Amino acid sequence: SQGIAQLMKKNKIEVFTGDASIVSVGQVQVGDQVLVTDSILIATGAEQKSLGPIAIDGQQIWGAREAMTPTALPARLLIVGAGAIGVEFASFYRALGSAVTLLEVAPNILPAEDTDISALAADALSQRGINVQVGQGLDGLASVDGCVEATIAGETLEFDAAILSVGVAGRVQGLGLDALGVAMDRGFIVVDERQQTSIPGIYAIGDVAGAPCLAHKATHEAMIAAETIAGHFVQGLQRDRIPGCTYSFPQIASIGLREQDAGDRALKIGRFPLYANGKAVVSGHTEGMIKTIFDAETGALLGAHLIGDSVTELIQGFTVAIGLETTEHELLETIF
């Protein structure tokens, strides 16, 4: 944060510290001051969701922040929610030696990923000793005598800690958005492709503006909003071209269309197992697959989904290819 403060100072950006609320279009109140401006950009991020009446207590029931700064390693750990964050923590704590149970109410872990990748990820986690349970909800969770008691499928199990990884919602409390009539959707601010909210002159970027909640997406949204506010034309955000990475063991990276979302669209699917790659064999990391999805008629690359060692370093090639609307034929002619 000190580095960011220096950047602000270097670029002559005036910083006001305090709780802010938007009192009207073009007016923001910070403490006793009212700041007048032509445009307002909301970048307040997101906050962790609780699970119904089950709240994060910071002791035995953790959110992501508490899970990153534990005072002791839990011998038995329950993770509720198997999205990217839940899977990352499952991999991390299992590598440290915890006995990990990963619980997901959806039919498969990593519900945002292509189902082939999700299935391979579940197998990989299970092989590493993680107890993966899908299609299973949590009936109850409570801290009891320094431990956590969880009720799953009618059975009460005991853990040393639990991580709630059930998603986030935009941090909008106290901003005054309801009074202004700013449109919301499932806890996030609704924006157009130029990041403007339903109220002209008010913009939103980052996690508060909705999924995917990724830092590189927020940075790009900031560029779009700044250029728009400055009166410059800029290409709007194309959400189908945002790469996502999960830093688990093995890693997962993806961009574009998932096969299960194609409907009746004619596709050409490519699957390449990493055990057929010489470098993977030599390095001893043969686990995983690269899956590509092309339009069967035009040959356009529509999606790429990867699982394996260091695949987060490979996704950028597919990101560029999709951005340039590259075809299967053009990729085949490319020397990598």
Predicted stretch roles:
Residues 1, 5, 69, 74-78, ...:
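Rossmann-like dinucleotide-binding cores of NAD(P)H-dependent redox enzymes
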Residues 17-19, 24, 44, 63-65, ...:
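Short loop/edge segments at beta-strand edges and connector loops
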Residues 20-21, 35-45, 79-80, 100, ...:
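Short hydrophobic core segments
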